[in-house]
Amino acid sequence: AYAIRNNICRCTGYVKIIDAILLAAELFRKGEVPPAPADWSLGQRVPRVDVEEKVTGTGIYPDDIYLDGMIYGSAVRSQYPRARVLAIHTEEARALPGVVGVFTAEDIPGQNKVGHLVKDWDTMIAVGDITHYLGDAICLVAAETPEILAQAKALVKVDYEELPMVRSPREAMLPDAPLVHRTGNLLTHKHIQRGNPAEAIAKSKHVLTQHFSTPWTEHAFLEPECAVAYPDGDGVMVLS
């Protein structure tokens, strides 16, 4: 339990993690690894095609890829969860030797919003617009080396008008809550009830009442956000 204390398993309640630990311990004790299953027919358990690369750490990710003449890019991000961007000063960053360019929302033609369910996520916050969270992209800096890139990002100055923020889902649901998005803070409203929870609690021998919280996390990512792109014929190949 101590070794996996920093792992929050929301899918199986640690079942698969504990099974994997016990299996690894058994293999270490026996000193031999059983052969991979040869039967890949329907209904049989088979290994993932990329499992060996992931568990041994030999997989290649975009951050491991280097190309000749590669340019490095990174975003300057908002310092406030909710603030209006008054001005973006990029002159000093652009003048730094080795900087290829500094791009803002004004340099994006057409649609500047993305999103899975609702396209309400600004790729970059334009002057006059309001940030939605701590880390919204303000501008994108491109440079010849990672060191120059870091220097250039530090030279970008942003003027903000700090605004009241929303600190929790409960605050977001209040009638007078600041709007994180112009269309409202609620994406959808659903009411689901199964059984009689009040009756179940009343009949329970032991009842524990407490406030529980876990840190926010995005699951499934094995590396920070990164992408590598290069010209490919008439288009662009993106590795991400």
Provide a role label for each language-model segment.
Residues 10, 141, 238:
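Conserved SAM-binding loop
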Residues 8, 130, 137-138, 226-228, ...:
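Structural motif
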Residues 197-240:
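Conserved beta-alpha junction segments in alpha/beta enzyme cores
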Residues 1-10:
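Immediate flanking context of iron-sulfur cluster ligation sites
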Residues 25-189, 207-210, 216:
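Flexible, low-hydrophobicity surface segments
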Residues 16, 21-25:
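Helix-loop-helix hairpins in multi-pass membrane proteins, especially solute transporters
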